Regions:
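Short intracellular "coupling" helices and adjacent cytoplasmic loop segments at the cytosolic face
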Residues: 45-46, 82, 90-114, 118-120, ...
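A short, hydrophobic C-terminal helix/tail in secreted or cell-surface proteins
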Residues: 546-550
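Membrane-integrated ABC transporters
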Residues: 1-29, 36, 44-56, 65, ...
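ABC-type nucleotide-binding domain
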Residues: 319, 325-545
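Helix-loop-helix
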Residues: 48-50, 54, 147-161, 231-304, ...
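Transmembrane helices of ABC transporter permease
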Residues: 10, 14-27, 57-58, 62-65, ...
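An intracellular "coupling" helix at the cytosolic face of ABC transporter transmembrane type-1 domains
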Residues: 101-102, 118-127, 131, 135, ...
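Hydrophobic alpha-helical transmembrane bundles that constitute the permease/transmembrane domains
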Residues: 23-34, 63-71, 123-126, 130-142, ...
């Protein structure tokens, strides 16, 4: 993972400009009490009315300059934090895309959504408005204390002592909030997961009349999320009033001490007025400490969560000595392949080969590992023992990009994106595919008949996961997507189960016409594989039998 410093370092010049604008704005702020001191001592008490116009003009000019540099400061911090947030989100999403399937087997989608969106937002906020205030508070305090020591060094020890006490309280508060925010971040991910699963499966929920159960499940997590936020609020309200109290009392205490000095002749009235103004400039940083500590603790917890994702390395990667095939013919061989997942034996000593242009049918009982063969061929997982070869080369030596571009797959669990039918079909070859090729693929998959009856035809936007389409329609679009890829290997995982016999027969005719394409067809129905050159059967004993075909 790139450190935060590397993101900030990219835009160091922007931060230098922002901090320089901030320093200038704060320096101008420090002039107000000085001008006020002059007005009291020289104009009101000294009767020098001739300088009043200059002093008032100075106040106006200082105000204009303060506004200009304040705008530059805030705009630059907001702009830079937005840029860094976008880059962090992009890098995190890119890293997630590189992770192996095993990681997604063990991680909820809602958790990843929370990390990419909510946690990056909190870090972005810390690098923007919150970070700006933290730097501003620090510089402001330094400038104010310098001015206060210049006016009366003895009285300056009072605000210094108070600020040190507030800093200690802020550290204690941060430590208490740190664990709470980690729990809040975890529960936010769980809550997002529950909501995402429920909304994605709303038809199943309604079909089984499980609305009440799902509501109770959501409310239980919502209540825990609420309780954690209340715990955070209790910590905040326990300490935050202290900062506010000190902020209100400090100017009063300085006024009393300064008044005594004025009466004793040790300080002018104008100097006292200026000193009180400076003390008020001390109070807002102290009042901000509680709020800043709260937001920074939240950002730190989010950073830790994101860091954990970056600590996960992909299990499936390109080998150091990648082999690039000049041409992929489509010869597939499984050589004594065994596969275990989480200690469970899925495949055991599986061997078969499919020559270029031939068709292999795979049948078997539920749970016998038929779909795991697809996982092996795509290198979603690596074999525990044995090897899978493509054109005689172990697929572990072939680049993942070339391997997966060489295999088109129609998965059992059809997933269509919330986009147009056109975009869903040309997903595998998006950059070069023309409309006539899209229509040809749809016709080959027997999908053009229902697509062209729609009002928008190929521009029809389908819902998430193909909501609004029948199971057979979704399967046909998925088949069209695979055919449009024109890969040398085509794998179909029980992908005609929702089709009627006539449509299935037409698709089989299309598959038979693909003479140069190696086809692996996984099915439960014998009708789906009856035209295969060879059929293997996978019983639950993890090995296979070869069935004769005619």
């Amino acid at each position: 993972m790139r450190k935060l410093s590397s993101y900030i370092g990219r835009y160091w010049y922007g931060y230098v400009f922002a901090v320089a604008s901030m320093v200038t704005a704060i320096a101008l702020d420090m002039l107000y009490p000085k001008i006020t001191q002059k007005i009291v001592d020289d104009v009101i008490l000294g009767g020098q009315m001739e300088i009043l116009t200059k002093l008032l003009t100075g106040i106006v000019l200082v105000g204009i300059g303060r506004s200009i540099f304040g705008y530059c400061k805030e705009f630059t911090f907001d702009f830079l934090s937005s840029k860094i947030g976008a880059e962090m989100r992009k890098d995190l999403f890119n890293h997630i895309q590189t992770l192996s399937m095993r990681y997604f087997d063990d991680t909820n989608t809602g958790e990843l959504m929370a990390r990419v969106k909510d946690d990056v937002d909190k870090i972005q906020n810390a690098l923007g408005y919150v970070g700006m205030l933290l730097i501003e508070v620090t510089i402001h305090v330094v400038f104010v204390l310098y001015c206060m020591f210049s006016l009366n060094w003895k009285m300056a020890f009072l605000p210094v002592t108070v600020m040190l006490c507030c800093a200690v309280v802020a550290i204690i508060m941060e430590r208490k909030l740190d664990k709470v925010y980690e729990d809040i971040s975890e529960e936010n991910a769980v809550l997002t997961t529950v909501a995402e699963e429920n909304l994605a499966g709303v038809r199943t929920v309604k079909a089984f009349a499980r609305e009440d159960y799902e509501i109770k499940k959501f409310l239980s997590h919502n209540e825990r999320y609420y309780n954690l936020n209340i715990t955070q609020s209790k910590v905040l309200v326990r300490y935050y009033p202290l900062f506010q109290f000190v902020g209100k009392v400090l100017p009063v205490a300085i006024t009393i001490l300064g008044g005594i000095s004025v009466m004793n002749g040790n300080m002018s009235l104008g100097a006292l007025v200026a000193y009180v103004e400076y003390s008020r400039n001390c109070t807002w940083p102290m009042e901000m400490m509680g709020w800043l500590t709260n937001d920074l603790s939240s950002a730190v917890a989010s950073y830790k969560k994101i860091k954990k994702i970056y600590e996960v390395k992909p299990e499936i990667e390109d080998s150091r000595n990648v082999v690039t095939l000049d041409h992929v013919s489509g010869n597939v061989e499984f050589d004594h392949v065994s596969f275990k997942l989480d200690g469970k034996q899925i495949l055991s000593d599986i061997s078969f080969s499919v020559k270029e242009g031939k068709t292999l049918g795979i049948m078997g009982a539920t749970g016998s590992g038929k779909s795991s063969i697809i996982n092996m061929l795509h290198r979603f997982y690596d074999t525990t023992e044995g090897s899978v070869r493509l054109d005689g080369v172990d697929i572990r030596k072939i680049s993942l990009r070339q391997l997966r571009r060489s295999v088109a797959v129609v998965l059992q669990d059809v997933f269509l994106f919330s986009d147009t039918i056109e975009e869903n079909i040309k997903m595998g070859n998006r950059s070069t595919m023309q409309m006539d090729e899209i229509k040809s693929a749809a016709a080959s998959a027997q999908a053009s008949s229902f697509i062209e009856k729609m009002d928008e035809q190929y521009e029809t936007v389908i819902g998430e996961r193909g909501v609004g389409l029948s199971g057979g329609q979704k399967q046909r679009i998925s088949i069209a997507r695979a055919l449009s890829k024109h890969s040398p290997i085509l794998v179909m995982d029980d992908s005609t189960s929702a089709l009627d016999m006539e449509t299935e027969h037409e698709i089989q005719k299309t598959l038979n016409s693909l003479k140069d394409t190696t086809k692996i067809i996984i099915a439960h129905r014998i009708s789906a594989v009856c035209h295969a050159d060879e059929i293997i059967y996978l019983p639950v004993s993890y090995t296979h039998l070869t069935l004769p075909t005619t």
